Amino acid sequence: MGGSGSRLSKELLAEYQDLTFLTKQEILLAHRRFCELLPQEHRSVEESLQARVSLEQILSLPELKANPFKERICKVFSTSPSRDSLSFEDFLDLLSVFSDTATPDIKSHYAFRIFDFDDDGTLNREDLSQLVNCLTGESEDTRLSASEMKQLIDNILEESDIDRDGTINLSEFQHVISRSPDFASSFKIVL
């Protein structure tokens, strides 16, 4: 990665800065980290911009390894039809949304998509159950009982489901998130 052919052009860097919430230095670091996941012979700028990295490789990054939503995060940001790999631009989009400078609206929009496990545009009881299981862990010691889960989801819906349709839509989710001062600062990944 030391040769002149291994750096992103000034034009491309400027374009990525315009399209993301990342600084020039953050984009260069992201490119370096992405290239480290590629085989040595495919690390030129041209090849790295065309390459796709498997979700397994992305999930091996220390910044994602401990995140309980890591698989969902990667699937939401993947543009491949099978959602099983990320391009460099997918990786940049992911880092941009999770950066300190991304707006609360952008962060809440993507958090909603990550928590919408069935991709139907709403958070229903099953999505909320999966969300809770991701947060509490799925071991016998940490898993909630069926009655505890039902009570928790009932409470979440009581608090969040403004139109009382049994689900949480994006605007209801954003309303709840707007009342959570720690959300934006906790919804981040730093390389």
From Swiss-Prot:
GO BP term, example: endomitotic cell cycle
Domain of life: Eukaryota
Lipid attachment in record (N-myristoyl glycine): G2
GO terms for cellular component: apical plasma membrane; axon; cell periphery; centrosome; cytoplasm; endoplasmic reticulum; filopodium tip; growth cone
One Pfam entry name: EF-hand_7
Membrane topology: Lipid-anchor
Residue positions binding Ca(2+) 1: D116, D118, D120, T122, D127
Domain EF-hand: 103-138, 148-183
InterPro entries, per database record: CIBP (IPR051433), EF-hand-dom_pair (IPR011992), EF_Hand_1_Ca_BS (IPR018247), EF_hand_dom (IPR002048)
The keyword Protease appears for this protein: no
Predominant cellular place of this UniProt entry's protein: membrane
Compartments (UniProt record): Membrane; Cell membrane, Sarcolemma; Cell membrane; Apical cell membrane
Domain-level remarks: The EF-hands may also bind magnesium ions in the presence of high Mg(2+) levels and low Ca(2+) levels.
Described purpose of this protein according to its UniProt entry: Calcium-binding protein that plays a role in the regulation of numerous cellular processes, such as cell differentiation, cell division, cell proliferation, cell migration, thrombosis, angiogenesis, cardiac hypertrophy and apoptosis. Involved in bone marrow megakaryocyte differentiation by negatively regulating thrombopoietin-mediated signaling pathway. Participates in the endomitotic cell cycle of megakaryocyte, a form of mitosis in which both karyokinesis and cytokinesis are interrupted.
Subunit structure: Monomer. Interacts with the heterodimeric integrin alpha-IIb/beta3 (ITGA2B-ITGB3). Interacts with ITGA2B (via cytoplasmic domain); the interaction is direct and calcium-dependent. Interacts with the protein kinases PLK2/SNK and PRKDC (via the region immediately upstream of the kinase domain). Interacts with PLK3; the interaction inhibits PLK3 kinase activity. Interacts with PSEN2. Interacts (via C-terminus) with F8. Interacts with NBR1 (via C-terminus). Interacts with FEZ1 (via C-terminus).
Protein's recorded name: Calcium and integrin-binding protein 1
Native organism: Bos taurus
Taxonomic placement: Eukaryota, Metazoa, Chordata, Craniata, Vertebrata
